[in-house]
Curated annotation (Swiss-Prot):
Catalytic activity from the UniProt record: (6R)-5,10-methylene-5,6,7,8-tetrahydrofolate + glycine + H2O = (6S)-5,6,7,8-tetrahydrofolate + L-serine
Cofactor(s) of this protein: pyridoxal 5'-phosphate
Organism, scientific name: Wigglesworthia glossinidia brevipalpis
Protein family: Belongs to the SHMT family.
UniProt name for this protein: Serine hydroxymethyltransferase
Molecular-function annotations in GO: glycine hydroxymethyltransferase activity; pyridoxal phosphate binding
Binding positions ((6S)-5,6,7,8-tetrahydrofolate): 121, 125-127
Source taxonomy: Bacteria, Pseudomonadati, Pseudomonadota, Gammaproteobacteria, Enterobacterales
Entry's EC annotation: 2.1.2.1
Quaternary structure note: Homodimer.
A GO term from the CC aspect: cytosol
Length: 420
């Protein structure tokens, strides 16, 4: 607990004890939620810095408050590093989250009620890609596209939808799709109907900068991403663009501030700058390659054990297990796995007949386990344990024995050594 002030335990024992329990949970659980990762100590130090004190509405050299000389330097550095990392002309580092970044893009380029194509939520899309429960589906008219019977993105169907509806924007990206996206085809379809191509690369940004996932940036008019997930930075958002004009970039900036946000979170922007520096290293690229290897090695075990993997495999850091063929629901599966200290999330499958609170599947991702040092051997072992549990959900002794094995494995690969 040495990242906390020595006297904090005395000052607020309740919060201290809760955080201590969460540290133990993170250390003793195998984290397989695809959107979660472990930030470095350097990133966390920035998030806990005195930069949280400074209000800085506006942009560098154009603030509404005084005292921003060094704040400007930090934001400029974050922008400079992001431009280099992603090879882009435009960056906005201020969005508080991926959803905020997406909202800003919609606000900049659309009017309420405009027609947009987005990936269907239970086919792998995200809430902000047109879900009726989300602002995107309430403010704009979304038509959903999805995957074919093999679980692959159906570009022919997308083209037909685009030709029929003539949308103002097509959104590409996902939260639970295990394949590649052909951005060139996406741009072709967008150009065919005169639509903006907006790419949300939140899940695969780390893979893209490492050169192992198709890059959306040369094809999309605008790109957003989160800065955690595979990028392994602080929780936050980012807007990127290349080869646009000043007017286009001003629209995006204005949509963030003053359009959808007030003051930026400078402690988070500093943490983003640190994460961008980390992402430029050879170590980071090796990490990205390993997390895909780990994902594929887990799929290999599930297929060997006759489990149904949506789309038949994975080309990135995640995949979906369809549990309907074994009569198991996603919410129950995730609950039982948690008893063995294995954390996954319930997830809808394409054309799921169950509602999103129950689901027919679970999503599995490898960013966190890879960050703590797991390689193919450990990943396969974890996959075997998951299979054993899902095939024997009422065997409490087996589940407890696997829990002990999980804890022992976790302590061989600590997340943060100094927290023990």
């Amino acid at each position: 607990m040495n990242i906390y002030y020595k006297n904090f335990k005395k000052y607020d024992t309740k919060i201290y004890n809760i955080i201590k329990k969460e540290i133990i949970r993170q250390e003793e659980h195998i984290e397989l939620i695809a959107s979660e990762n472990y930030a470095s100590k350097y990133v966390m130090q920035m998030q806990g810095s005195l930069l949280t004190n400074k209000y800085a509405e506006g942009y560098p050299k154009n603030r509404y408050y005084r005292g921003c000389k060094y704040i400007d330097e930090i934001e400029d550095l974050a922008i400079k590093r992001a431009k280099k990392l992603f090879n882009v002309d435009y960056v906005n580092v201020q969005p508080h989250s991926g959803s905020q970044a997406n909202f800003a893009v919609y606000s900049a380029l659309l009017n309420p009620g405009d027609l947009v194509l987005g990936m269907k939520l239970n086919h792998g899309g995200h809430l902000t890609h047109g879900s009726k429960a989300n602002f995107s589906g309430k403010m704009y008219k979304f038509i959903s596209y999805g995957v074919n019977g093999e679980g692959k993105l159906d570009y022919n169907k997308l083209l037909n939808l685009a030709n029929y509806y003539r949308p103002k924007m097509i959104v590409g990206g996902f939260s639970s799709y295990s394949g590649f996206i052909n951005w060139k085809k996406m741009r072709f379809i967008s150009d065919k109907v005169g639509a903006y191509l907006f790419a949300d690369i939140s899940h695969v940004a780390g893979l893209i900068v490492a050169g192992i996932y198709p890059n959306a940036i040369p094809y999309a008019h605008v790109v957003t991403t989160t800065t955690h997930k595979t990028l392994s930075g602080p929780r936050g958002g980012l807007i990127l663009a290349k080869e646009g004009d000043d007017e286009f970039y001003k629209k995006l900036d204005s949509a963030v501030f003053p359009g959808t946000q007030g003051g930026p979170l400078m402690h988070i922007i500093a943490a983003k700058a640190v994460a961008f520096k980390e992402a430029m290293t050879l170590k980071f690229k090796k990490y990205q390659h390993q997390l895909v290897k780990n994902s594929k090695s887990m799929v290999e075990i599930f297929l060997k054990r006759k489990f149904h993997v949506v789309s038949g495999g994975t080309k990135n850091h995640l995949f979906i297990l369809n549990l309907s063929n074994i009569g198991l629901k996603g919410d129950l599966a995730s609950e039982i796995l948690e008893k063995a200290n294995i954390t996954v999330n319930k997830n809808s499958i394409p054309n799921d007949k169950l509602n999103p609170k129950i689901t027919s599947g679970i999503r599995i991702g490898t960013p966190a386990i890879t960050k703590r040092g797991f390689k193919e051997i450990e990943s396969k072992k974890v996959a075997e344990w998951i299979c054993d549990i899902l095939e024997n959900i009422n065997d409490k002794k087996l589940i407890n024995n696997i829990k002990i094995k999980v804890i022992n494995l976790c302590y061989k690969y600590p997340v943060y050594k100094s927290f023990k």
